Amino acid sequence: MTKSDLIERLSSSQQHLAAKDVEAAVREILECMAATLESGNRIEIRGFGSFSLHYRAPRVGRNPKTGEKVELLAKSVPHFKPGKELRERVNSL
């Protein structure tokens, strides 16, 4: 599902809301989540899951084309951990 699909589905299920309002709400939610992670904080949505940052230490990688060794810098990457309710819903398929 893409962001456009999400907006379309929400607009059709919440017909009392204008599509532009739904789009603005989705955009604002995603921006708020990105800003929260950017500031180093964790996001927890009970029953759904949590978003956090995981630290990746610097390491020596390899260029797949040339085989040349490349120094990779340390970085933080976003991580999603599904909640119990979401895991149970997905596993019941």
Curated annotation (Swiss-Prot):
UniProt keyword annotations, A-Z: DNA recombination, DNA-binding, Transcription, Transcription regulation, Translation regulation
Keyword DNA-binding applies: yes
What SUPFAM superfamilies does the record tag this protein with? IHF-like DNA-binding proteins
GO MF: DNA binding; structural constituent of chromatin
Pfam families xrefs: Bac_DNA_binding (PF00216)
| Disulphide bonds in the chain | none
UniProt key word Plastid = no
Q: Which GO terms describe its biological process?
A: DNA recombination; regulation of DNA-templated transcription; regulation of translation
Q: Which family does it belong to?
A: Belongs to the bacterial histone-like protein family.
State the function annotated in the UniProt record. Answer: This protein is one of the two subunits of integration host factor, a specific DNA-binding protein that functions in genetic recombination as well as in transcriptional and translational control.
Subunit field text: Heterodimer of an alpha and a beta chain.
According to UniProt, the name of this protein is Integration host factor subunit beta
